[in-house]
Amino acid sequence: MSSCVSSQPTSDRVAPQDELGSGGGSREGQKPCEALRGLSSLSIHLGMESFIVVTECEPGRGVDLNLARDQPPEADGQELPLEASDPESRSPLSGRKMSLQEPSQGGPASSSNSLDMNGRCICPSLSYSPASSPQSSPRMPRRPTVESHHVSITGLQDCVQLNQYTLKDEIGKGSYGVVKLAYNENDNTYYAMKVLSKKKLIRQAGFPRRPPPRGARPAPGGCIQPRGPIEQVYQEIAILKKLDHPNVVKLVEVLDDPNEDHLYMVFELVNQGPVMEVPTLKPLSEDQARFYFQDLIKGIEYLHYQKIIHRDIKPSNLLVGEDGHIKIADFGVSNEFKGSDALLSNTVGTPAFMAPESLSETRKIFSGKALDVWAMGVTLYCFVFGQCPFMDERIMCLHSKIKSQALEFPDQPDIAEDLKDLITRMLDKNPESRIVVPEIKLHPWVTRHGAEPLPSEDENCTLVEVTEEEVENSVKHIPSLATVILVKTMIRKRSFGNPFEGSRREERSLSAPGNLLTKKPTREWEPLSEPKEARQRRQPPGPRAGPCGGGGSALVKGGPCVESWGAPAPGSPPRMPPLQPEEVMEPE
């Protein structure tokens, strides 16, 4: 059985091959891609088939946007897959094994970036959307999340265009795939795009999970867990749409085409990655741990105020922004609740960060807020010691240690007694006596004995609600690529008819049963089932229509049927092309 936690430090890893970013080059002052350039030579490429976890970026890997802009373009006509086709180009798995649900990540750090005291790469300054600004306030009204239900994917010469977004480098890799750097041409801003394959989610839904207890029913005021992976994704979107806090990652846009397999979630770019890797030989100092933990407290207090339980708090889900503050990410297993607390009975999340009451054999109902407090305690322990408090190579032994083993502190590094007291109270195995968030905010270690008080709940939290009308008004309808090509062709041919209609009908007629020996029509638009006399009655008096069936007229210079119609007599009204008969559907 795969191990849950490894006590060995993460080994050096080989950088994965750039799969898409090499096609993102552009000249200075130009956008990465010229939209709809050369539509006649467009090709559509779609190779995404991954469930992306935004927070699973390579820790310490900065996104060098200058390199992303200056990479050489691909050759014309070369396919641009979103995942490397060569298995040897993928990075090997590292020694870190956080859980059965979380594989190791790989990726290089840019050598041109500077390093902070933790060795984490710091990227150059870049433009951000107002939502990602450090000055954003949770008390400001949030702009409704844009939902696009029509997705146009264009394979151009040097990039892959997804609506207004140009997909570039791979900036992270999670349990189900990759995260792509996305450039928005409308606001000249970089974002992180999370891609989900609905088919793959359904295939992977068979991963072994603990069955619900017999006769279990959701408690009043509690949560009802979604039944399938697709429902979990849409629950994550519903939760993220209503959140607006400096310490919570923001969902900017959702691109969803009901007729296609993929769903795209566009997030603000948190460019410095997770706060730390676990396990590590370089834990944080107490001052650094306090700084990040204060951000975590404010973010969790805000989530609980919005009646949301995160259920997967851990260092890899805490991303460091350009301003140095952390943002909570990955709401894939979150729960919304009614009342004062969530009443839960199922087991989800990362095993090493699960609370003992969630691992009980009796499957009793337990508090959702207490689960987040336990995970916060494990995270704080990781901050200062670089490892989890309970570790084992076997999942069942790990569960046993979490439920019964006493908490121990290593001799090194030596930490303050106040910090030991806080961790001990957060990792209380009894959820009823476990410390709660309001008490954590006032703890002497958190506030430096009152020198650094945290804001009150009223200052930190504002209830955010998005009405259905606001969501409907935020939906953006974008024509598909086929529609754009059709309009382009109609304009080029100066025709108001569908230039592809004839070929489609001919193919359908030849494929219909009983029509294999039917004589080919003399005009491309002629339906096989309409008699010749009916066609003649439908035509207006005048010269006989040419072979293109009235696709143009002499009034349009260069039209496809100029030779068939000729010029009208002087002084006579202009002739109109014959009416095109209505399409008759052939049996299939």
UniProtKB/Swiss-Prot annotation:
Subcellular location: Nucleus; Cytoplasm; Cell projection, Neuron projection
Main enzyme class: transferase
Record's catalysed reaction(s): L-seryl-[protein] + ATP = O-phospho-L-seryl-[protein] + ADP + H(+); L-threonyl-[protein] + ATP = O-phospho-L-threonyl-[protein] + ADP + H(+)
Chain segments carrying region Calmodulin-binding: 475-500
Modified residues (Phosphoserine): S99, S114, S129, S133, S137, S495, S511, S572
Active-site residues (renumbered): D312
Region of interest (Disordered), residue spans: 1-34, 64-147, 205-225, 497-588
EC number: 2.7.11.17
Any Gene Ontology CC annotation: neuron projection
PROSITE patterns: PROTEIN_KINASE_ATP, PROTEIN_KINASE_DOM, PROTEIN_KINASE_ST
Keywords: Acetylation, ATP-binding, Calmodulin-binding, Cell projection, Cytoplasm, Kinase, Nucleotide-binding, Nucleus, Phosphoprotein, Serine/threonine-protein kinase, Transferase
UniProt subunit comment: Interacts with calmodulin.
UniProt family annotation: Belongs to the protein kinase superfamily. Ser/Thr protein kinase family.
Protein name: Calcium/calmodulin-dependent protein kinase kinase 2
